[in-house]
A protein has these predicted regions:
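Conserved helix-turn-beta segment immediately C-terminal to the redox Cys motif
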Residues: 66-68, 84-108
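Thiol-based oxidoreductase modules, predominantly thioredoxin-like and allied folds used
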Residues: 103-116, 132-144
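Thiol-/selenol-based redox modules, centered on thioredoxin-like
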Residues: 160-203
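N-terminal targeting signals for export/organelle localization
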Residues: 1-50, 197, 201-203
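Hydrophobic beta-strand positions
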Residues: 48-52, 167-168
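Short active-site neighborhood of thiol/selenol oxidoreductases, capturing the structured segment around
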Residues: 59-83, 89
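Sec-exported extracytoplasmic/periplasmic mature domains
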Residues: 94-101, 126-130, 149-153, 192, ...
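Short, internal strand/loop/helix patches
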Residues: 122-162
Length: 203
């Protein structure tokens, strides 16, 4: 029964597209690609996002490349599903241990970047005892929408945001989705499977 439940809360990206894009695309922001960009960098792009401390990050190069990430979409004014998801993320933050902020990061991306300013998100993050390595991200709407689109979390109407966590190990290429409102202990199992994934040994 436990395995069946885990199968229910996990869905592989392979069942949709490579990274599970949303069906409806936002307007693409101006994008610049380096000549030596990797396939992953070209896909995810380096749109600039801003965290709760006002720090700027390139989406792929700074936030994803070589890292284990748990990504969630939310908005600070959500009072139903988002608090539940964020409490689960608080549990995953503890599960990450001293790797949080080193090679493991939690990325909570606002679907309401106009309202969710860095200042507002800084106060919001305190509610969930966010430690260094848990970024609450906002920025220009076109950049935020594009980042969400690339992880399959973009919605035209912010009230319809997803209750799905995207959990990935960029180094090994293992990506999973999990129901963000599931029990924290079940999400921890999914997180651990991605965290502990190893790249195949080279001959």
């Amino acid at each position: 029964m436990k395995l069946l439940f885990l199968a229910f809360i996990i869905c592989s990206f392979a069942t949709t597209s490579l990274y599970g894009q949303s069906r409806e695309a936002p307007v693409a922001p101006p994008l610049k690609e380096a000549e030596n960009s990797s396939t992953a960098q070209k896909y995810f792009s380096d749109v600039v996002l801003v965290n709760q401390h006002g720090q700027q990050f390139r989406f792929y190069s700074d936030l994803l490349n070589g890292k284990v990430v748990v990504i969630s979409s939310f908005m600070a004014t959500c009072t139903s599903a988002c608090p539940v998801k964020n409490r689960n993320l608080e549990k995953l933050q503890e599960a990450a241990g001293d790797r949080l902020g080193k090679d493991v990061f939690i990325l909570s991306i606002s679907v309401d970047p106009v309202t969710d300013t860095p200042e507002r998100l800084k106060e919001y993050a305190k509610t969930y005892h966010a430690k260094p390595g848990w970024h609450f991200l906002t920025g220009k709407k076109e950049n935020v929408d594009w980042a969400l689109y690339k992880i399959g979390q973009y919605v035209p109407e912010k009230e319809n945001h997803f209750n799905v966590l995207v959990i990935g190990n960029e180094s090994t290429g293992l990506w999973k989705k999990a129901f963000g409102l599931a029990k924290a202990e079940d999400l921890t199992i999914v997180f651990a499977s991605v965290l502990n994934d190893k790249a195949p040994a080279k001959n």
